[in-house]
């Protein structure tokens, strides 16, 4: 946690956590050696400090799990320092896994892939994060982050289309290669 967030948490604790059932704060992500301070990456406000008697975790454990509380939530100053990816390959693999899980979730809810979702939604995700929210101010890091996030939307839509057309999303298991025996 940043020094500012540490001080805000201590102040809330010293007040007995009396003003809210939970506290959210900005998550500042390190993206391959640079903290992203613009675009869709920041401020990524998350609820992480809460009274367990008044809340808990909801959602699927693998994706989009979130804290939820009964009562008011306050935003604390400062940043939660976040190191989400060790490498670009890890991010791409995680993005693909999340895209598949979300496509399966949306398919189960009856959502459908459309050409506009395939073409326009990724473009909008990129332009919103990179231009409108200032991701370009993070340089190459911001460009790559915006591109990978847009590609997630594209992957999810393609996987949703595959599911609605009864096509496999993953490759079937391969038979062992016996040529080397």
Language model region names:
Residues 2-166, 174, 181:
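Catalytic-site signature of metal-activated, phosphate-bearing donor transferases
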